[in-house]
Every structure is written in C-alpha cells, then in structure tokens.
C-alpha cells in the first residue's frame, strides 16, 4: 500500500536526523554483528562505509543517468549489489511495485532481488519522509542474532522504508573497524553509486531533508523502477559509530564483527533496532501487504516478521488463526516498502535513563492497568465466599494433604518433625573422629545456648507479653493510693514536675520502699493521707514532707528515717517512736536499715502520727520530711544517730522534734522519717486540720498548721496524749537523753514545750496561726494528738529506753525527761499559750515545760537535756515548730508556758486525729519513742541538741547524708531545734562526728564551732540542730548543720525548742523536700521544715538553715523557730534567694527560697502565711544567724550549693538550689556552721536562704510561714527578718529573731524554727 502521506523531505526532518547523528550511540558498535547473508547480486550486501554521520546535504545529487529523485534505499544503505543503482522502470521484485517511488504509510521493506538490472540510477523515494527515532517500547521481538537494537527516540508517525534496486554494488569499505566502538570508515562509493549518493555521503538513513520526496511524514519508495531495493530507514545522515540500542544485549556480539550492508549504517541500525517488536507492514512487489511484528533484519536488509499474516483490505476484522504464520522472512529484493506505524519519536528523550525511571514503567507505559470489576457470575458466590471466610482451617486439612500426597505422588507424609523425607539422617558411628565432632558440636551448642544473646532472644521469643504490656502499660498496685503501704508509691505515676523531688528525696514512693523500712509505711500514710499534701501545698506539701520526708528519704533517708534507727532496734521497731530521734543516735549505723524498718514503722499512720505530733509541737517536723529530719536526727543525734547518720544531726534539733523527724527520715529515706514524723500529724485530724492553712505557710504537712500538725500528727503515733514529745524525745535521743541528765532532759523538754508554746506552737496548734506563725499550724495538729497520746508515748519512750540502747545514756533519761517535760511542758505551754494563744496551748505548754527544763539543765548536763528535749520535742515537735520562736524565753519561763499550754495541748490532742495515727506509727517506732509522750513538742528551747544530738546523732546525720550522698553535698543544717536540743557533747559530737556525715566533711567543725558558740547559747541550741542536713526533700542529702554553733549559749532551751519546732518545721520542710536542717542551735531547720511543709513537696528538704546564735531570747527563739514556718520563711526571706527557690511546683524548694529571701530581706518578703509572726521572729532569727551563719551555712562548707540556690547569699543559695528537685541540701559543714553559728549573721543567712528556698513555695511571700530558722541575736538583721517573715511569730520577740549575732539567741531560734 502506498501512502500519499509521504512527502518531500523537509528541513525539519533533516534536523531531526542531524540530531540523531549528534546523539551518538556509542553502544551500538558493540552490537554490530557480522553480516549473516552474503550480499545479493554481485557481492554480498556489503555495507558501504557510510561516510558521514552528518546529515546528508539538503538535496541529493542527481544520479548521472537520470533525473534527481528522492534518495533511494541504495543512497541510504549503499548499493545492494544490483548494479550501479540505475533504476529500471519496469523491473519489479516480489510482485514488484512498478512506477515511480511513492511514499508508503506503511514502511515496507521490499526484498530486492539480487541481480535485478538497475534501472536508471534514479533515486527511490526516500525512506520515510521523517526519520522515526528509535522506539524502545517496541523492542518486544527478538532481533535476529545479527541484528542489534540500538535505542533511539521513536517518532510517532509512519516510518517508511523504500527499497531501490541498484545495479552497482556498493564497494565495501576495506577499512572497517572491527572494534566495538563502531567506527566506520567511509567506503568508497561504487562507480554508479557515486553518482547516486549524496555528496555528503548518505548515512544509514538518507537524511530526510536530503530527499526531495513529496511527503515529509512518510516516504514509500517504489521498487518498481529499481531492480533491487535496499531498506532505507527514515532519518538521514548516517553516522559511523553504532549507537547503544535498547536491546543491545540481544544477539551475539563478537569482537570480530564486520559491519556489512545496512549494519554499517549507524542510523539505519539505530532506527531498525528501535522498532523491533513494533507492528510492521511490509508491501511486497506483487502488491500484497503483510502485517506482523517486526522481529529482526539482516545486514542485507532481509526482514523477519513474527505472527505475520497477509492484510486484507476487505475485512476490518482481525486475522483468522489459520492465517497467522509464526514468522516470515522477507528478502530485501522482495519487498518494496516497510512501514512502522505509530512510532513515538520522543520516547528516547522523554524520560531520564535512570534505573528508577526505566523500571517505573512497563515497557515504556506509565499508566497503570485498568482494573475491571469482578463478577462472580450467577453461582452462589456470596455463600461460597462467606464459607471461605468462616473456614479457619487455613487451607488444606493436614490429613487431606497427606492423603493427596500419597494418592498422587506416592509420598507418605507424617507429622514427624525430623523431616526424614527431606533430609538424610546422620549416620552415627563409634569412630573417634565422629565422637570428637559430636562432642565439639555439643560444646558449641551449649556455648550458644548459654550465651546471654541466645537467652535474651529465647526470652523474647517466649515472652507472651504484648508490646503494650512491656513498654507502654502503666501498672499500679491497688494500694498505691494508700499512703501507708511500703510500696504505695512504687508504681505510682509521678508527674514529671514532681519526679525530681521524689527521686532525690526517695520521696513519696521511695520512702515507702524497703529502703526506708518504716518510712514507706509511715511516710506513705502521711503521704496518702495527705495525698492532698502532695498536690496541695497545704496538705500535700507538709504531709509529704513530714510524712514522707518522702523527698528526703530517697537521698537522705537516713536522717529522716533515722528516728527508727535511733531506736536501737531496727528502724522498723523504731517507727512507732520513729519520730523520736532518741534511739537514732544509738542507731546511726542502722541508718541503712532505718529506711526499711523505719519506713514501715513510720509507714503506719499511727507511728507517723506520733512522730508528726511531736514534730508538730516541735516544729522541726516540718523540716523532718526533708531538712528537719536531718536536724532532728542531729538533735536526736543521740537517739537519732543511727537513723540519720547524717541527718541525725538535723534531727538533733529538739529531742522531740529531732527524734520525730529522724524517725520519719530514717524510715523512709532520710526524709522519710521526718516525713513520717510530720506526716503522722498529717494523718491525724489535727494534722489535716492545721495542714490546710499551715501547710502552705509552714510547709509542714497537710496545712498551715501542718507544721505543728504534721509533727503533732506524727507524734500522735507516739502517744495520743503527747505523741510528739514521746516519739521525738525518746526516739530522737534515747541514748542522748540517757547521757544527758534527767534535769537536762527535762530542760530540753521544757525548751521544746516553750518553743511549741511560742508563736510557732500557736501556729501549729491553731489554724489561724497559719496567718501568724508558720509553726503554729504544725503544733495545732500535733498538740491534740500529743495530749491524747502523751502518756502513752511516755510509756512507750520508757519502754524504748529500756528496750533499746542506741543512745545508752539518753533513752532512760529521755523517758524521765519526757515525763518531766510533760509537766514542764504543761507549765511552759501555759505560759507560752498565754503568749501564743493559738493552738499551741497544749502542745506548747508541754514543750515549754520541756524546753525550760531542758534549757535549764541543758547547760549543766547537755546529755540529759537533749534527751528531754528530744522526747518533748518529738512529742511537741509540731508545737515546738510553731512556738520555736517563742521559746526564746528562759527555760523555766518556757517550762511554765509549756505546762500551761500542755493542758491546751491535751485538749487539742483529744480533738486531734493525729493520736490514732501516732499510735500506728508507734508500733512502727520503737516503744521507747513513746516516752516522747512528754508533750513538750512545742519545746522551742534549744533542747534538741541534748537528746537528738547525742554523739551518735551527728554520725547518723552524716551517715544519712551519705545515704543522701548526692544531696548531702549540701549538708543542710538540720532543724536547729533538733540540734540545739542540747549543747550536749552529743550535739557537738555530731558536728565533730562530721566524719560520720560524709556529705558534710566540714560539719564537725561547724558543729564544734557552733557548739562553742553554743556556750553562749543554750546547750540545746549549741548541740541542737547545728547540723543542717536539709537536702531538697527529694534529695536525701541532709546538710548536717553543726548545732555546735552555740554549744555554750544558754540557747539550750531554745535549741530544744527548736528541736521541738524543728520536727514540726522540719517535718514539713522535709515533707516539702526542702530541709533546712540547722543542727546549729537554731530553729533554722524549722525554717527548712517550714518550706517543706509549705510545699508539701519532699524537695523542700533543701530548706535548710543554719541558726546563727540566736540572741537567745527564749521567747524570741521560739518565735524565730516559728519564723521558719513556710509562710514565715517566705515572708522572712525577702531575700532574692527566696526567689532562688521559686519552684512553685516544688513547694518545698519554693518555700525554702522564699523563706530565705524573707529571712535575709527581713521585712522585704511579706509573710504570706499565718505564721507571719513566727516568720517575723524567724526572720529575725535568720537575720541574726545571717551575719554569722549565712555564709557558714551556705558556706564554702556548703560548697556544693544547691543549684537552685543562688550564691547571692550563701544560705539562700544552697537552699534555693534544693528547693525543687535538687537533692543537694545546704551542707553546712561544722566548720561552716561553726562560723555560721559563731557569727549569727552567717547562720541567719543560711537559715534564711535555706529556709526561704526550701520553706517558701515558688512564691516566697505567698507561702505559709516557712521554717525559717534564723538564729539571730535580738540585735542583728533580725528585725527586718522578723518583721517580714518572722513577725507572725510574736512569741519569740523580734529581738530574738534578728540575725543572731550571738550564738545563744541563734541556737534558740533554731530551736524555735
């Protein structure tokens, strides 16, 4: 079929061919294949050396013998052996198609018959008007072995090839490169061909532009006039090198390939190869048209079509099966035109030739298959499909498979796993070689199976747990919400904001953990009971601090937990009286165990209550959870020694207070006992009641009164009547108390009572106190339970004294002292109560009595005094905290107050819920702690040192710091109340025993110095909680604050008072995690306690404060102690450091920083908490201490200043650091403490900073009074502090609170705090 579509070549076509020529296909040459067929006619169709790859000239030169005509196939391919290319008008090959060359829509490759006489050398119509670039998509059919398939860009449109016979054979170029690079040497054209060829030499394909053929789209060349025809491919300009074809790998390339015939024409090869696999129509000379798939071609242009059939014009339908022939070979002389339709000329250049691009399409097609809907037909397909869905057999039934295999394949299948049918069994033999190999194999197998990797892999394979169970599920125990179980907090979810504190302090969860044997229980109860505390600054913060000391427990569980350890028996036995640091001193070594046993003992609500009660009255309880615990331990140093190793010193504060906090701390984890102690109060109704208001201000347990309450609550554990004193005094200083003379013990008791009676005590006792003294709240809680359990506790303490020998000399004495304290405390409380109307009445009275007694005897017999103080303070811990400031008044005076208030306290105790808790706690604690029943919890006096400090205590304190080693970095003075319990040698010893307090190497010195200064202060003050081991509640590092600040100061009473308050204050603080334990003779620990309480975060432990020598204004001291209340602290510490501890999330830390700021700034920080008056006094005390103690407490000794603390003020800085998650508590090394205590300003500063940081919540002013233990002389910066933070503590005069320039006052202040 000839197509009129053929048109004269156009320049565009020429351009295209030029482009093909330019785009050389280097790979083609490698595809060259030897000519399979010898040329037709004269010689085989030797491919002429088609001279140039350049496009042929615009017009072909007319052959000499005839008119110019479109380029013929011979032009493109060279002569086909038919003579010189003369065209014979009449000659036809294969049904020859006579007539002038015409374009074919179908590219026909007529086979030229060799020897056909050439007609006139006229040119046949060019091979296709437009050169069709290769089409890679058409290479479906395999080319003949010798036919390469160069890749080329196909051009959509007809590709026409016409054959023109030529008489002259084109001479083969003798120089044919046989290399695969396909370099063609130009072949000299044969004589005739020379005329026929275009001057530029025709390429494989005559350049489209070179041919004047009429059609540009396709050209069909009629071979009618040509004796022979040659395939002419579209596209002109042959190019020498063979290009790289799409199917270049097809065929058998050989290194020795002679490019004959059309193979020598690069362009021709390129185009033909590119159309392999495409639909092709071949018109033969007889006019028939055959259609098929172009498969291959030979060098002589013989074509092979697959699936060929003759195309009939009549029927439009497809060919019949019988008409299709597998393949047909068309000789070059037989066909006229070959046409390839619908070629994509842009295919080659359309896409990138990258593997991904090529593989992205199937054979060049980009579109995806069209999906057709499936029709199930009329069968019951739905039912069948459903049946398949319901079929769970997973395919064949095994028996069916076995049967099928057997029937069809003769294979008998079984379930035998040995695969005997597929494997060859080992042939066992007894040869030596085989046995060796077998042994070696067994050895290797054993090694592999015993390897950790193998076991891990097997474990994974055998692990039935799901990914969720293994990695994402949160599993909690049903008892997690019960604060009393040891594992209560183990799996409890802790919000990220609270994790630091908890971890550092061995906080809530940990304190419950076995490590804090009892604390877990006591601490937990307090914690659970005051779960609110956790989240509630009032409730949670204090409770947590007191109860859990949780913050403390983790890092410094020893001190807090020490209370139990105090009891000679394990911490667990101690728990009931755990609060009482009496035993801990004896038990310093038990500190490790103290966590387990104490936690359990304290874990019980009752034990917690007992301790908290006492602490409540004492005020250290606040600190107890964190800082206070340490101070208590220190104070209890005697009993608490074991508990606190490091913290004991802190516990040292007032015997009661110290004892209680130590217990809590010991039990849980450093802070746990304190927590327990303070926590118990929380547990008790009183604890809860005061907690809400006081907790914030004091940072004690549940509420504002939490300080007192927590302590009270804790104490309740010891005895319903006077749980605090009992727990604290006896446990705190069983040994210490014994060591101390009964009179001294009594004095301690009185001091504590006084302290409790002091504003702090009032606060503790009365919620309203929240507003005024921060400790008041603590006392409030603790007093009622204290009164109720007072006698019980006393009995317990006596038993403990007899049963436990941790503090050989102080236990029995503690019992006596406790009894004395109770009496004294009642008197003192009455007095104090008069002064401080708030609920400090009962608790305060007892504390006052105790404190007075302690204070009086303390100087004479420090050992006894601490014991009494410890008992009283423990019992009165909360009260002491509240009244700690107030306790500034002389020991006797305080004693009277205590006695007076004792009655009130008894009433309160009856009302308080703490007593039951205290009882529970008592079982945990050693029975001896019960002696702390002496309700001298208020005991603001510096009696803490007598009992608490016990020689052992210092060691325990440090030990606890060791426990809280990280936290211990900053030994925070344990509640000064604790240390100041008594300036007894014990107190100094703790300081001296700073070695014991590993965390605070300098502690001993400080303590000694403080102790020396203590000369000025009451013995209690001196010995009291000089050790300020008040790491952040969460951190167990209690800074052992050498209570030695003012060992000689008359501040002894104050110290007991501090001790009492310390438990109260510290418990909260400890709970709050900010423990500013100033073992120094001040109630500074109370400060810390306060902050802790306020925050209810255990982190508050950092609220540590060194009590510089308070002016030893007994009244002022207690007040000062109160100042430590969280609120007070916050107010007290207007100091920027208060800001340092701005952790709002961590109330304790905040409390401490705030308190500190207030303390330092004196009046700068408004007292947010009701403990304001206490704060005021505390502030005074802080200021007093500030000069001497600020630097000391936050001394180089404290070198590792808690990060949160800003160096701005040594005291503050460390304290601030503790506030939140920091475990570091101010480590007030004895040396530092010494200067601190020696220099009231220094000490005051420390307490200020610490207390403020730890005591004050994130907002310094907002928090309830912090346990700002600033022991400042009446003179000193006390005024500012007292005014700002301590003002709420009217019991202790402002004068007392001023930075304690002289040690005595400072110690006393600590006690109060």
UniProtKB/Swiss-Prot annotation:
GO terms for biological process: negative regulation of receptor internalization; P-body assembly; regulation of translation; RNA metabolic process; RNA transport; stress granule assembly. Its main location: cytoplasm. Expressed in the brain, heart, liver, skeletal muscle, pancreas and placenta. Isoform 1 is predominant in the brain and spinal cord. Isoform 4 is more abundant in the cerebellum. In the brain, broadly expressed in the amygdala, caudate nucleus, corpus callosum, hippocampus, hypothalamus, substantia nigra, subthalamic nucleus and thalamus. Residues 267-344 form the Sm domain. Residues 627-637 have a biased composition (Basic residues). GO terms for molecular function: epidermal growth factor receptor binding; mRNA binding; RNA binding. The gene is ATXN2. PANTHER family: ATAXIN 2-RELATED, ATAXIN-2. The modification Phosphothreonine is found at residue 741. The modification Omega-N-methylarginine is found at residue 640. Residues 1-12, 104-114, 141-154, 166-187, 204-234, 563-581, 666-681, 847-871, 925-936, 1155-1192 have a biased composition (Low complexity). It holds the Pfam family LsmAD. InterPro entries: ATXN2-like, LSM_dom_sf, LsmAD_domain, PAM2_motif, Sm, SM_dom_ATX. There is a cross-link at residue 893 (Glycyl lysine isopeptide (Lys-Gly) (interchain with G-Cter in SUMO2)). This is Ataxin-2. Involved in EGFR trafficking, acting as negative regulator of endocytic EGFR internalization at the plasma membrane. Keywords: Amyotrophic lateral sclerosis, Cytoplasm, Isopeptide bond, Methylation, Neurodegeneration, Parkinsonism, Phosphoprotein, Spinocerebellar ataxia, Ubl conjugation. Monomer. Can also form homodimers. Interacts with TARDBP; the interaction is RNA-dependent. Interacts with RBFOX1. Interacts with polyribosomes. Interacts with SH3GL2 and SH3GL3. Interacts with SH3KBP1 and CBL. Interacts with EGFR. Interacts with ATXN2L.
